[in-house]
């Protein structure tokens, strides 16, 4: 089984929204590599404590960490950004660790579009397809499944979506099949998504960093642009699951 940790960045609003994009970033790890990966993360958090004075019990929540630091004001802003770059580089060197990114461009969507469902359905479908073709690394099983662990989001809406996809899931035909859709219910995503407070999950905190820099790649704020953080996501290339999209060099699925 694969464990999938997901976090969001941006918002789903189509009117008067500060963001033009809604982003999801998912970390995928096989259960057999989970403990090994967790131990690596704990060692890395100890490194952050020694280098920056960032405690193991403290939460990385990017937008607050950079722009509304509160208790983290003890760490200079430039050093906080460097800490986040270290988080990116740490992940890029992990083995048996992959990331799928989904971005919904809200600028070209008509009023009334369901941005939340579009993003999550796209991500879930990519995970389902990859499980079917056994393209995730870290397993020799004949067939694996996956469970979703997500930061706080619209729990009811996500639950309704995943349950619906198990019964009715229209998927556009590939080019060789012509126009139209096929009904391909998902079978490999186990149970409803489990919602976790990111304060209690190092993995979701990593997904938060990835989702933040995913959104900054498309719509960077002035500070990130000035400091060169717009392309921090590119540093994750060794662990990006680029097969998720052939249309983007980093494999980002853009809708």
Model-derived regions, located:
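Phosphate-ester processing/binding pockets and catalytic centers
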Residues: 1-255
């Amino acid at each position: 089984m694969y464990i999938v940790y997901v976090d969001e960045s941006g918002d789903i609003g189509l009117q008067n929204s500060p963001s033009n994009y809604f982003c999801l970033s998912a970390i995928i790890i096989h259960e057999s590599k989970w403990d090994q990966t967790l131990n690596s993360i704990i060692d890395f958090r100890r490194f952050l404590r020694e280098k920056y004075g960032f405690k193991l019990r403290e939460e990385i929540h990017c937008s607050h960490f950079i722009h509304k630091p509160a208790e983290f004001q003890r760490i200079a802003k430039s050093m906080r950004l460097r800490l986040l770059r270290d988080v990116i580089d740490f992940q890029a060197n992990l083995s048996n660790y992959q990331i799928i990114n989904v971005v919904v461009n809200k600028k070209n969507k008509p009023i009334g579009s369901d941005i939340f469902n579009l993003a999550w359905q796209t991500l879930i479908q990519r995970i389902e397809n990859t499980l079917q073709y056994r393209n995730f690394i870290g397993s020799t099983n004949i067939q694996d499944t996956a469970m979703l662990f997500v930061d706080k989001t619209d729990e009811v809406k996500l639950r309704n979506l995943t349950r619906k996809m198990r019964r009715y899931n229209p998927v556009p035909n590939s080019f060789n099949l012509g126009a139209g859709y096929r009904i391909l219910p998902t079978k490999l995503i186990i149970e409803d998504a489990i919602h976790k407070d990111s304060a209690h999950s190092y993995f979701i905190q990593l997904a938060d960093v990835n989702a933040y820099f995913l959104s900054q790649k498309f719509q960077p704020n002035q500070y990130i642009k000035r400091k060169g953080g717009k392309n921090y996501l590119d540093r994750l290339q060794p662990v990006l699951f680029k097969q998720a999209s052939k249309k983007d060099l980093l494999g980002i699925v853009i809708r």
